A protein has these predicted regions:
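Short acidic/polar N-terminal linker immediately downstream of export determinants
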Residues: 1-80, 89-110, 126-127, 239-246
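Extended, compositionally simple hydrophobic/Ser/Thr-rich segments
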Residues: 40-43, 49-61, 89, 105-245
Length: 246
């Protein structure tokens, strides 16, 4: 059982192809099946501060050195896979118009400083060490997942589709924008000042210490622990903003 083999819904033989910025769709008969014979290549990441993962890439990410990525894939997919650096950004995914199935797509990534991270398509990114710094931007869509610890001054987090942030650690301030059925699983994340906007059927759980400003629409739910001063609390539909007493 390899983590890279399932489609977004766990269906065998599912495949993703690129269809515009950040978008993936099931595709047709000209897809390439992974051979099962794995190859790896190393990419220099000097100066890279942004990582964008797509398709079904499984990424282990940490900060430190040396700044490089080791990308592992089936040996017959090298022409289908995008693993390249442009400016300060590493992009991992499938080339536009290409399609793969039963593929192993893995990357071990080390950057000196992380400012932006995106998990698109069905990618999964795990942070192996706390991300530090003044500001960190996280984006996730599709069924993308970002998991791990943060320790930053400001956290800007945006998620859509059925994506998941599973975060721990702390941030002095956080702005969260969630749509679709996305989730913020942050029972071990503490934010001093949170501004959250949720719509659709989103779920968010987070610790808030000083101030909370929140808007929830649709059937979304924000659960917070702590006793912050509430500066905005707007709900509509059957959405809710509730203090978690557990």
């Amino acid at each position: 059982g390899n983590a890279g083999q399932d489609g977004a819904d766990g269906a065998p033989g599912g495949s993703y192809s690129y269809s515009g910025p950040g978008g993936y769709s099931y595709s047709g008969p000209d897809e390439v099946a992974g051979s099962g014979r794995l190859i790896s290549r190393t990419i220099d990441l000097s100066g890279v501060t942004s990582v964008v993962a797509g398709a079904a890439f499984v990424v282990q990410l940490k900060t430190g050195g040396p700044a490089q990525a080791t990308v592992t894939m089936d040996d017959n997919l090298a022409d289908q896979i995008e693993a390249s650096v442009t400016g300060h950004e590493l992009r991992l995914g499938i080339k536009p118009g290409r399609s793969v199935r039963n593929a192993t797509l893995r990357a071990e990534v080390t950057v000196g400083q992380l400012d932006q991270l995106a998990a698109n398509g069905a990618s999964k990114v795990t942070l192996g060490s706390p991300v530090t710094g003044s500001a960190l931007r996280l984006d996730a869509n599709g069924t993308g997942q970002i998991t791990g610890p943060v320790a930053v001054d400001h956290l800007e987090a945006s998620e859509s589709g059925a994506s998941v942030f599973a975060l721990s650690g702390r941030a002095n301030s956080m702005h969260l924008n969630s749509v679709g059925t996305s989730q913020l699983q942050g029972p071990d994340l503490t934010v001093l000042n949170l501004d959250a906007v949720l719509s659709g059927a989103c779920q968010a759980t987070v610790g808030v210490r000083d101030t909370l400003a929140a808007t929830a629409d649709g059937v979304s739910t924000l659960r917070y622990r702590g006793n912050p001063q509430i500066t905005r609390q707007q709900t509509s539909g059957v959405s809710s903003i509730v203090q978690d007493s557990t």
